[in-house]
């Protein structure tokens, strides 16, 4: 079970409140019913993240069955292609891609999707290792490990 502090948007986001909590198909997902994709293929829809941790944070959402590994593979492939194109065009220095699977891992929308986060050199200094997905987010102010209280 998640707390309000962990996912404050869940309790206040009308799109999430009005959506099916565990959709069985893409057409029942919160994204399909409340937003238009930035682009899409026959297997993947790409949306801007409603709560971005960095400018350009996108979600790559499988349109295939949520139990079909080909769908999530396609989402990762599309995110990777876009990231490499952004690097080639000089729009970003690097990027993170990843998933949260299950509430204990931070998932708040229960349909498979890949987070894509563009990164710039030095975009988050002073929080441990200078690279990696953890540095895309500001430190948790409630964490006992946070040295910036």
Regions found by a protein language model. Give the residues of each.
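HIT superfamily nucleotide-processing domains
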Residues: 1-149
């Amino acid at each position: 079970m998640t707390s309000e502090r962990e996912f404050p948007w869940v309790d206040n986001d009308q799109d999430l409140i009005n959506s099916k909590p565990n959709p069985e198909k893409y057409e029942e997902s919160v994204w399909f019913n409340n937003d238009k994709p930035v682009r899409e293929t026959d297997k993947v829809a790409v949306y801007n993240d409603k709560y971005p941790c960095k400018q350009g944070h996108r979600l790559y959402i499988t349109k295939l069955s949520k139990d079909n590994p080909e769908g999530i593979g396609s989402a990762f492939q599309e995110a990777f292609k876009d990231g490499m194109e952004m690097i080639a065009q000089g729009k970003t220095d690097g990027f993170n891609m990843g998933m949260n699977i299950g509430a204990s891992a931070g998932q708040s929308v229960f349909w498979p999707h890949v987070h894509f986060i563009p990164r710039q050199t030095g975009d988050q200094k002073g929080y441990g290792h200078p690279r990696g997905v953890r540095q895309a987010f500001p430190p948790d102010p409630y964490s006992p490990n946070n040295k910036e209280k």
